């Protein structure tokens, strides 16, 4: 069973439909239900500050899931809130599961960065099993993560090169939306579901 964390951050149905192609899914904000799942997805569309406020009752549950080495996938805002803090809402702490912060794109013609863009794979990662390097995925965001180099799996160019995929132990995250990225995005979800 795959658990999708429901914290009023939108986009739940599209990720649910994508995951249901490969496994049973529960969308929930109930700690016991989440702790019983084999894998967890933290989706997200919206604002860093309100996301952290809505997630507050589930923080300890998320830490336990990660500590128990349950495969965990953050998507878009769900990637960003894994970090320590964001320029989007100064003074609000992120989950701090991944060291680093979230910064706004600078010196770009247009925000948000929206549409299809390629991901250059810089390190082996099971999420990209069977996926060609420089494949295209769908992005919608104005901020990007700024992590330690050792957890970066994929990079994307938009005004500058930024980390678009990370992996640290059992935690995986994508800045793009695999559920909106056609067959190649579904392959990412399938690879996540099949993780041991």
UniProtKB/Swiss-Prot annotation:
GO cellular component: cytoplasm
UniProt keyword list: Amino-acid biosynthesis, Cytoplasm, Glutamine amidotransferase, Histidine biosynthesis, Hydrolase, Lyase
This enzyme's EC code(s): 4.3.2.10, 3.5.1.2
Catalytic reaction equation(s): 5-[(5-phospho-1-deoxy-D-ribulos-1-ylimino)methylamino]-1-(5-phospho-beta-D-ribosyl)imidazole-4-carboxamide + L-glutamine = D-erythro-1-(imidazol-4-yl)glycerol 3-phosphate + 5-amino-1-(5-phospho-beta-D-ribosyl)imidazole-4-carboxamide + L-glutamate + H(+); L-glutamine + H2O = L-glutamate + NH4(+)
Major localization listed first in the record, in broad terms: cytoplasm
UniProt-annotated location(s): Cytoplasm
CDD domains: GATase1_IGP_Synthase (cd01748)
GO biological process terms on file: L-histidine biosynthetic process
Domain Glutamine amidotransferase type-1 intervals: 1-196
GO molecular function: glutaminase activity; imidazoleglycerol-phosphate synthase activity; lyase activity
Keyword RNA-binding attached: no
Pathway: Amino-acid biosynthesis; L-histidine biosynthesis; L-histidine from 5-phospho-alpha-D-ribose 1-diphosphate: step 5/9
Domain of life: Archaea
Active site: 76, 177, 179
Complexes and interactors: Heterodimer of HisH and HisF.
HAMAP family: HisH
Record's function text: IGPS catalyzes the conversion of PRFAR and glutamine to IGP, AICAR and glutamate. The HisH subunit catalyzes the hydrolysis of glutamine to glutamate and ammonia as part of the synthesis of IGP and AICAR. The resulting ammonia molecule is channeled to the active site of HisF.
Protein name as it appears in the record: Imidazole glycerol phosphate synthase subunit HisH
């Amino acid at each position: 069973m795959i658990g999708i964390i429901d914290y009023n951050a939108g986009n739940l149905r599209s990720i649910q439909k994508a995951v249901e192609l490969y496994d049973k899914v529960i969308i929930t904000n109930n700690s016991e239900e989440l702790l019983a799942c084999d894998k967890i997805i933290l989706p997200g569309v919206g604002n860093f500050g309100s996301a952290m406020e809505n997630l507050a009752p589930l923080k300890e549950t998320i830490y336990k899931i990660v500590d128990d080495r349950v495969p965990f996938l953050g998507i878009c805002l769900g990637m960003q809130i894994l970090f320590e803090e964001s320029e989007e809402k100064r003074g609000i702490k992120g989950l701090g599961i991944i060291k680093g912060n979230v910064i706004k794109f600078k010196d770009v013609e247009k925000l948000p960065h929206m549409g299809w863009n390629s991901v250059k794979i810089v390190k082996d990662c099971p999420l990209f099993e069977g996926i060609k390097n420089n494949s295209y995925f769908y992005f919608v965001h104005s901020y990007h993560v700024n992590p330690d180099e050792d957890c970066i799996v994929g990079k994307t160019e938009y005004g500058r090169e930024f980390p678009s995929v990370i992996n640290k132990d059992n935690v995986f995250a994508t800045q793009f939306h695999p559920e909106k990225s056609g067959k190649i995005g579904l392959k990412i979800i399938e690879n996540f579901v099949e993780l041991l």
